[in-house]
Design a protein with these regions (language model features):
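Helix-loop junctions and terminal segments of transmembrane helices
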Residues: 1, 5, 9-38, 91-96
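Membrane-interface helix-loop junctions in multi-pass transport and translocation proteins
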Residues: 71, 101, 108-143, 155, ...
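Membrane-interface junctions at transmembrane-helix termini in multi-pass inner-membrane proteins
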Residues: 78-109, 149-155
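Membrane-proximal transmembrane or re-entrant/amphipathic helices at the cytosolic face
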Residues: 177-231
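Interfacial segments at transmembrane-helix termini and the short loops linking adjacent helices
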Residues: 35, 52-82, 88, 128
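Transmembrane helix-bundle signature of multi-pass secondary active exporters and lipid flippases
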Residues: 1-13, 17, 44-48, 80-84, ...
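Interfacial transmembrane-helix starts/ends
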Residues: 19, 27-43, 47-55, 71-74
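Membrane-embedded alpha-helical segments of multi-pass transporters/permeases
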Residues: 7-10, 49-57, 115, 119, ...
Length: 231
């Protein structure tokens, strides 16, 4: 079940390695800088998470056919991995303010709540309950770190936007697990909604990366898409 969610955590690690230096060296306008980067980063992660949940069944069938049943664990593990990536990003606020003990306390709060929820959720829902508990436990860490980041550096995660994304992703996960008629269509529509909702953030990252990866062709593509958006 960890095979697909690991894609998100790997992306998070790559981003964090590149981001950490900028987080420490950027001093002027730090709150605005952190807020802008988080918005772009979270947009990409939300879109990736939606796609993983939507495609996890066919992908698990093709690539991990002997463990196909494990697809049941993918939806909420994907949500948990998304929270884990956010927690790693917000840890930068502790690094730049030299308050590493806050990182420890937030993780401890998440671990304790995770253990308590595991006890009850596994009783109620079996093994899937453990994935739900992981999501909520890491979600608690995310909320605590978001509050700390706001207090320490004035950063905003735009909680309304984040809540909408997580609500839609949770709805997609529940639809997939419930397996109603045409569940593939409904989860696909929710994935499309997530992508449209986060398009501005994803495109902001693409505008930076495409010219570096594709050179002149990338710049032409960026210009064409920008003109299309303006129309």
């Amino acid at each position: 079940g960890y095979f697909l969610p690991t894609i998100l955590t790997t992306l998070g690690l790559i981003f964090y390695d590149a981001w950490q230096l900028s987080a420490v060296t950027e001093e002027e306008g730090r709150a605005r800088f952190f807020t802008k980067i988080f918005r772009t980063y979270s947009s990409v992660l939300f879109c990736c998470a939606a796609g993983i949940i939507w495609l996890c069944r066919p992908v698990m069938h093709v690539m991990k056919s002997n463990y196909y049943y494990a697809w049941h664990f993918v939806p909420f593990l994907t949500l948990a991995s998304t929270c884990s990536c956010f927690n790693q990003f917000l840890n930068s606020a502790y690094v730049v303010n030299k308050k590493s003990t806050h990182s420890l306390w937030t993780m401890l709060a998440g671990a304790v709540s995770n253990c308590i929820m595991n006890y009850f959720f596994i009783k109620w829902w079996g093994p899937i309950g453990a994935t739900v508990a992981s999501f909520f436990g890491l979600g608690i860490v995310f909320v605590l770190r978001a509050l700390d980041a706001h207090n320490m550096i004035g950063m905003s995660i735009h909680p309304g936007r984040v809540a909408v994304n997580f609500d839609v992703l949770a709805g997609e996960a529940l639809l997939l697990l419930a397996e109603p008629p045409l569940y593939g269509l409904w989860t696909g529509l929710l994935t499309a909604a997530i992508i449209l909702f986060n398009f501005a953030g994803v495109w902001a990252m693409a505008r930076m990366l495409l010219p570096k990866l594709l050179g002149r062709r990338g710049r032409v593509l960026v210009s064409a898409v920008d003109n299309w958006i303006k129309k």
